[in-house]
Swiss-Prot record:
Classification via PANTHER family: DNA-BINDING DOMAIN, ETHYLENE-RESPONSIVE TRANSCRIPTION FACTOR ERF105
A GO molecular function held by the record: transcription cis-regulatory region binding
Upregulation: Strongly induced by ethephon (ethylene-releasing compound) in buds and in leaves. Also strongly induced by cycloheximide, mechanical stimuli. Wounding leads to a both local and systemic expression, independently of ethylene, and through a de-novo-protein-synthesis-independent regulation. Wound induction is reduced by methyl-jasmonate. Induction by purified xylanase from Trichoderma viride (TvX) and another elicitor from Phytophthora infestans (PiE), that appears to be mediated by a protein kinase cascade, and to be negatively regulated by protein phosphatases.
Biological classification of the source: Eukaryota, Viridiplantae, Streptophyta, Embryophyta, Tracheophyta
Main location: nucleus
Source organism per UniProt: Nicotiana tabacum (Common tobacco)
Gene that encodes the chain: ERF5
Recorded GO CC terms: nucleus
Name of the protein: Ethylene-responsive transcription factor 5
Domain notes: The AP2/ERF domain binds specifically to the 5'-GCCGCC-3' motif. The affinity of this binding is higher if the seventh amino-acid of this domain is basic.
Length: 291
């Protein structure tokens, strides 16, 4: 009885001859034939292919197989059916060897699904979109006012030409806004030219008149009060000058003085005679008075 390896080789040769598949030997031949000589695998394949081309097909293997099956008169159809069942019995043993050898030679070592490392689920953070609010800038209309010009640093200067000084410029000041500078120009123009002045805000000329009157009235009233107080002080300080009367010196009693007294009409001259002074060294002489 032939060994299982010999039966397998015969079946493989028959299938190769019938199907004319050159790659069949690399995949379905048992391991001892294909991989016994690992160093000279290419040479063995070439030699097997040349032998198959030179040999003629014979049914000797079929006869051997018929002897084992104890049937001498076996047609080719029964042979293939029996060979198929016989090949299926050996397929379980040969396929794992061929696949294992093929995997080990051609592909890298494969691990089982359980031995694989679990895949990492890395959540990529979403990119935060910054919301930029666009500020709509409303374009403001720049109006040019008469007598106003803007400085490079943003301030507004007001000037006016004085007709009394041959058109020389008069500086009115620097302001934060153009409207304030225009109003300052209107006030100055109204003071210089009156109702003939060309102003930026003609409807506010009446306000300028009221403001000027309010400014002038307190100033005039204050001046009048100052003058009145000065006059009062001057009147108070003026005093009437009174001259002191120096009494006349008492004349000595002489016959002439007595005659003057007696000749008086009132008769009071007698009683107004100065008394005789006891201190006087001379009798009938009054005391001398030093003036």
């Amino acid at each position: 009885m032939a060994s299982p390896q010999e039966n397998c080789t015969t079946l493989d040769l028959i299938r190769q001859h019938l199907l004319d598949d050159n790659v069949f030997m690399e995949h379905y031949c048992p391991q001892p034939i294909l991989y016994s000589q690992s160093s000279s695998s290419s040479e063995s394949l070439n030699s097997i292919a040349s032998e198959l081309n030179n040999e003629t097909f014979s049914f000797e293997p079929t006869l051997k197989y018929a002897d084992t099956a104890q049937s001498s008169n076996l047609d080719i159809s029964s042979f293939f059916n029996n060979s198929k069942t016989e090949f299926d019995s050996f397929e379980f043993e040969t396929k794992p060897n061929v696949s294992a050898a093929r995997i080990s030679s051609n592909s890298p070592k494969q691990t089982s699904f359980k031995e694989r490392k679990p895949s990492l689920n890395i959540a990529i953070p979403m990119k935060q979109q910054e919301v930029v609010q666009k500020v709509e800038v409303v374009p403001t209309e720049k109006k040019h006012y008469r007598g106003v010009r803007q400085r490079p640093w943003g301030k507004f200067a007001a000037e006016i030409r004085d007709p009394n000084r041959k058109g020389t410029r008069v500086w009115l000041g620097t302001f934060d806004t153009a409207i304030e500078a225009a109003k300052a120009y209107d006030r100055a123009a109204f003071k210089l030219r009156g109702s003939k002045a060309i102003v930026n805000f003609p409807l506010e000329v009446a306000n300028f008149k009221q403001q000027d009157n309010e400014i002038l009235q307190p100033a005039n009233s204050g001046r009048k009060r100052m003058r009145e107080t000065e006059n009062e002080e001057i009147v108070i300080k003026k005093e009437v000058k009174r001259e002191e009367r120096v009494p006349a010196a008492a004349a000595p009693l002489t016959p002439s003085s007595w005659s003057a007294i007696w000749e008086g009409e009132d008769g009071k001259g007698i009683f107004e005679v100065p008394p005789l002074s006891p201190l006087s060294p001379h009798m009938a002489y009054s005391q001398l008075v030093m003036i």
